[in-house]
Amino acid sequence: MSATPVAILKTGLVTSVGLSAPSTCAALRAKLTNPSETRFIDSSGEWIMAHQVTLDKPWRGLTKLLKMAAMVIEEALSGVARKEWPHIPLLLCVAEPERPGRLDGLEDQLFLDIQTELGAQFSPQSAIVAHGRVGVAVAMAQARVLLGQGKITRVLIAATDSLVSWPTLSHYEREDRLLTPSNSNGFMPGEGAGALLVGTDTGTAGELLCTGIGFAREAAHLDSCEPLRAEGLSQAIKAALSDAGLEMHHMDFCITDLSGEQYYFKEAALALSRTLRERKEEFDLWHPGECTGEQGAVAGAAVIAMADAACRKAFTKGSNILAHMANDAGQRAALSLQFRGAT
């Protein structure tokens, strides 16, 4: 292992199937889903369906993002005294710059609005992580660096995102990427927020650890004309496993950000075939997006929170978990997660 593991101390989630991490993860385990009609109609005259988060008021845009973010941050920090919050860096994950229909204010206004909503300040080491679906993995790498400096013991990673807006939906509808009655090769848009309070590994039993992080770039990304061989994702997986001092056959199952498109399922299958060199009886592939829809930057937080809940409640296939995420533009990320059970 080339770096100190990062411990997942507490999680928070807001999704279309639950307004907290426990309720969302229970729904994910039961494979519940809650799509609803949006205000928008596609080119065939059908209502566009989405996994929408229902809050106290019908907030939209930046306001809804900050309300959801505030909820998950409060959940993840529920055991931390308010006076300690200013010493905790907040790494806020948002949509990537190239996202169609991306809201203005994600790099500056959103962070300030969240602090105002919470009535709190976070550490000057806080940062915006605008990397979409791979953002939480990028933030995890940044958190590991911050924790490794020895001056802080906790970092808060939060993500908030929504694909439920007309500029975004109309783009994906024109590209035939939305799941509709006439298109099975698509995703259902979603929204939500997630938070992970992470800290230094103290050897405490019953904690999920991030022991390896890997990144790469896929040349044959979704919009390219190159044949898909999953080279980028395979490289990211190998890097994460090498970082953790593990091999693919040590992993018990995989949790990913897959949300419905055949391209990404094919990529995941190819990456598994390229990295798994010893036969295993089974190797399950979990994907929370089947219940929550495509959540963009929130996907990584949902993946890790699901892994954490599954380990703590002992309904996993084992304690070694591979997680991986992918952006449309080619960025790939993988994490090695290991649960230290009670002795």
PLM features: residue spans?
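Conserved "HGTGT" condensation-loop signature of ketosynthase/thiolase-family condensing enzymes
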Residues: 1-141, 145-151, 160, 164, ...
